[in-house]
């Protein structure tokens, strides 16, 4: 990135593909309506047995802290690929961490703290080739959840001025999302009595009304049930049902 001299930056993983007109479509869009800082496109998941198109659930432009909020709770795709960035977003003070998961998310969180204008185009421009070694197939344990959340919290505090005094709440948004991912994995052991989880519940209680604007009742119910070790089988059953529902909705939307 330090050697890049162009106006824009786009990312391509080594085993993925760009559609022939992806850069043309995205560069044409980034200058519209007074100019955007980021343009996002849809992508195609390519597996051995099938291909599937994934469209962003968000289509309206984002400004201010909207991109940060969406990135922290993963309501949009948080990858670096599938996006076109203005070069200057990567200048002056982006930290890079040797993480095995969430590297793209961490960069996008830091960029989001710069309050970019973001535009979404209804164009399938990126072909994501999924392999058994893909990062979303790697083990995700409680220790890594705690590590990642601590790094995010540190970055949010570093950008506290641009976050208008809401760094603590945005750190909570991230913790709820990442711990929910841990809880939703059936093989994850119960850790509801750990300090990280107890602090999470305490913060969630203080920001209960605010969290309702970002997370569903079902998501918050899972966190409440997770308080009790005996409820772990119920949590696993509910998360399985929610996962099936999400998968069905995606298939019907194609």
Q: Can you say where each PLM-predicted feature lies in the sequence?
A:
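Short, conserved alpha-helical segments within structured domains
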Residues: 103-104, 168-172
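Flexible helix-coil transition and linker loops at the boundaries of alpha-helical arrays
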Residues: 158-169
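Generic detector of well-ordered alpha-helical segments enriched in charged/polar residues
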Residues: 68-69, 153, 170-173, 197-201
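Alpha-solenoid repeat scaffolds
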Residues: 18, 162-163, 206-210
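Short alpha-helical segments used as structural interaction elements across diverse proteins
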Residues: 80, 172-174, 229, 242
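Amphipathic alpha-helical repeat scaffolds of TPR domains
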Residues: 170-183
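Nucleotide-sugar donor-binding/catalytic module of glycosyltransferases
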Residues: 1-150, 154, 158-159, 252
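Membrane-interface aromatic/basic loop that binds lipid-linked glycans or pyrophosphate carriers
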Residues: 185-254
């Amino acid at each position: 990135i330090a050697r890049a001299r162009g106006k824009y930056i786009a990312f391509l993983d080594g085993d993925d593909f760009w559609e022939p007109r992806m850069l043309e479509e995205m560069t044409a869009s980034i200058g519209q309506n007074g100019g955007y800082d980021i343009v996002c496109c849809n992508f195609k998941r390519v597996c051995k047995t099938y291909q599937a198109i994934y469209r962003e659930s968000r289509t309206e432009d984002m400004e201010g802290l909207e991109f940060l909020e969406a990135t922290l709770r993963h309501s949009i795709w948080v990858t670096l690929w599938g996006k076109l960035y203005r070069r200057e977003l990567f200048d002056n003070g982006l930290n890079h961490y040797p993480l095995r998961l969430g590297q793209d998310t961490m960069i996008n969180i830091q960029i989001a703290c710069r309050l970019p204008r973001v535009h979404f185009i209804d164009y399938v421009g990126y072909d994501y080739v999924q392999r058994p070694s893909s990062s979303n197939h790697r083990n995700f344990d409680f220790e890594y959840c705690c590590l990642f959340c601590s790094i995010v919290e540190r970055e949010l505090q570093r950008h506290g001025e641009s976050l208008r005094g809401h760094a603590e709440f945005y750190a909570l948004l991230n913790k709820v999302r990442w711990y929910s991912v841990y809880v939703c994995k059936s093989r994850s052991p119960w850790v509801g009595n750990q300090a990280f989880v107890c602090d999470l519940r305490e913060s969630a209680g203080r920001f209960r009304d605010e969290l309702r604007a970002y997370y569903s009742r079902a998501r918050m119910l899972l966190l409440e049930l997770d308080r009790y070790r005996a409820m772990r089988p119920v949590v696993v059953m509910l998360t399985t049902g929610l996962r099936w529902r999400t998968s069905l909705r995606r298939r019907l939307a194609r």
